Amino acid sequence: MRQSEVGAANAVQIERINDLWAYVLPDDKLVTGSSYGNKKCFANSKATGAIENLFSLDLGRNVIGSTLIRYYDAESGILLEQTGSGDFIIHPAYQKHKFKLARGLRISEIFYVPNAPQDNLDKCPAAYLGLKIVNKTSEVQKIAAVAYSDLRPTYLATTPDAEVRFAYKNKVIIASNRSNEQWTRFFGTTAENAVCSYTTDISAVNDNFNVTPRLVSSCGKYIGIDFSAEHCSVQYVPLTTESSTTDSAALNTEDRTIIGRIQVDIEVPVGGEKQFTFIVGFSPTSGEDALQTFELLEDYEQAYKLTINNFVHETSYSVVTTPDQVINRGVQWAKANMARVKAEYPQGWGFTNDPSLSSNIVARDTAWFSFGCDYVAPEFSKQALKVFKRLQSADGLIAEYYNGVTGDVDDYQLTINDDTPLYILAVVHTFQISDDRVFLEEMYPSVAKAADYVISQKDERGLIFCRSDGVGVYGICGWRNIIPNYAINGAVTEVNAECFAALRAVALLADYMGADERAAYFRAEATKLKNAINKHLINPKSGLYYLNVDLNGNEHPDVTCDQIFPVIFNVATPATSHLIIDRLNRPDFLTTAGLRTVPRTALNYHPERGWGLTGGIWPDVAFMFAYSCSTHQPDVMINIMRGTFRQYELDPTNQNTVPGQFSEWYHGESLVNNGMKLSPWFPPKYLWTAVEGVCGISLHRGLHINPNLPLIWKWVSLSNMPYHGSAVTYFACWVKGRLDIFANYPFSTSLKNAQTELDDDISALIHERLEEIHLVALATPSHVVICIGNMTASSTSFTFSVSEITETYMTPGRYRVRVFHSEIDDWYDQGVRENSNIHGFSVGLEVGGFKLIELTKQVT
């Protein structure tokens, strides 16, 4: 299936490939390539499809630089260049570049990082650059595919003393650092008859002639000289098995780039194809381990298949399905982005806020990540939070970040921060979804200590007060902490709102622990804090909250995006919440790309200063704003979620994005991305907004479902949500003016609706599927409800069999069959039949509509 945005000023197509949504676009429309990672590495690519770097999470350094492939005529050595425009396929698991060479050969280069639990592929610090050559011409084609790799990168890299050691089995170049010989890189191929060499001349990659010893005799007639080694523009050192270390007398490598080179000569028959791969990788422990990793990765087809399957698996959890395919894709890609950055550092599980540039793991980001990650991989959330527990200060403060490699901790000398309450909230959220009592018992002392510390920072008014008098990270205790020469200290509304929610949350954990007195204490402190916030931090002139009341008692009435925090954390009254949402929903704040951090009409607005924190657009703030609108204005929530993800899909050339990747921040006027191409903590916020905002999931003392449907929607669904060791699926729809909810797990709701609790999700027993049709089948052996939703922009029909349900699941007997038609908002009774006579259904579906098919066993 292929989709495109009508009237869009770009050529991005949307396709379903390998059971996931992917993007297809001309290869001249990217300004940067995709990014992929696993537990031990992260790799970026360029707009050309070349690998840009391989970053080791164990070292926190780039270990291999750019890797690319060039093509030459095998007899003359003349460079064969791309002809015409090619295509990129941007898939959650890989990036494929398809193009033609001068002779009409069709090339596919595929870049991916192995990421699957089988054989610990997700712990292999390596990247593939695969190659498929198809000959559609009328002649046998002989070409040389030559891959080059920078084995001594300098940007954020190890010490520049990597040396080439030898070529293992004549197809893998081995290099290691002189100062740390255990740090071993490999650059190899699965192709037969490879020739390995290296050079210190970076111009080799740009040479229009492929000059190797086997071509010496024929090069003269092409370059017009009596060819000899002295005339060669690039000097290579050939490598053989177990060669000695680099001979500096033969080729001086001191302080010079080292370019590994692997040549594969290929003869492609008419109508035939050749396929193999190049692999770059690293071991922080030994050359032997590096070679074992390479040999594991040689089965590249299996690694490719398992990596795709793993992404399909990761995205199968908490599937949010709505009539709006843009939001559906956004949720899928959010989970795919998260799967690329979940890592295992020397210090433990976590993720950096700046992949391939930093190893710092921020508590704030980890907390927000867990709110979304809990709906996909709660075990990762647990392990990531446990690291912060281990590094917690003696007084209870949670530091701003730790370094995942060294374990160094920095709290920026703040007396209070947003990290501490967010850590508490994250631990509680993870416990609520997992019901893991071992995790609770391990983490409760830490969160209670953190809560006690929060309370200790109250001032005489009962407000949480930051006494740090610095600027930037040393004087801003909230999330916008990297604004230079700026302070947000004292009583900060953002942090106070988070602390209220944290104290209320830790009271809940105290209840579970049977610590009744502590629970009552935390609950009372939370109530007092909320009252103090609404007494001292509301601006009587505007009815909105102050940004902060600083160390000198000055009230800062700045209206910024931070107004969302009292709404999100239930500090604001309904009336104040409506006032805040209305203010943020105005054009000087809200754009098609997201929410400006400071309104365009403010005196201190600037579209890009301070990393966009004084007027730029941070999409994750828009996700939080969308969540805050969920119960007040769901139509606004949906428009924001749709618009922000479309910004990630459309026009990557002008917006400096990669389709499907959640980039960081935009210029407040041009809406062009100025930040990182994949911001790790944005995707989980989008997922969190979809699950808790759109689908209305709440975890407080049990499962609550209160969907927030905009006026234009008739249904919404959530499938396979992890909860207390089970998988929750529900379908909610408007039936005769009432929102009916069908679910396979006991739940409560505050809506005036009909609840139908069934035992099992038996959707897998219906095998017919259409990409634009959503189907959920929930049942007990005597009661089956099949829910079918239309996601297309037109009316459609769908035919499917239920024979496996009626023959293997349902209790034998007579069943009344009813069908609900959304277009007429009424049920149609199809009579009573024996289950053996119920074989299938064919339904018509209106735009955005649904059908319910109910089979109820009759009592005789």
Q: Predicted segment positions?
A:
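Non-catalytic C-terminal accessory modules of carbohydrate-active enzymes
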Residues: 63-65, 72-110, 115-117, 627-829, ...
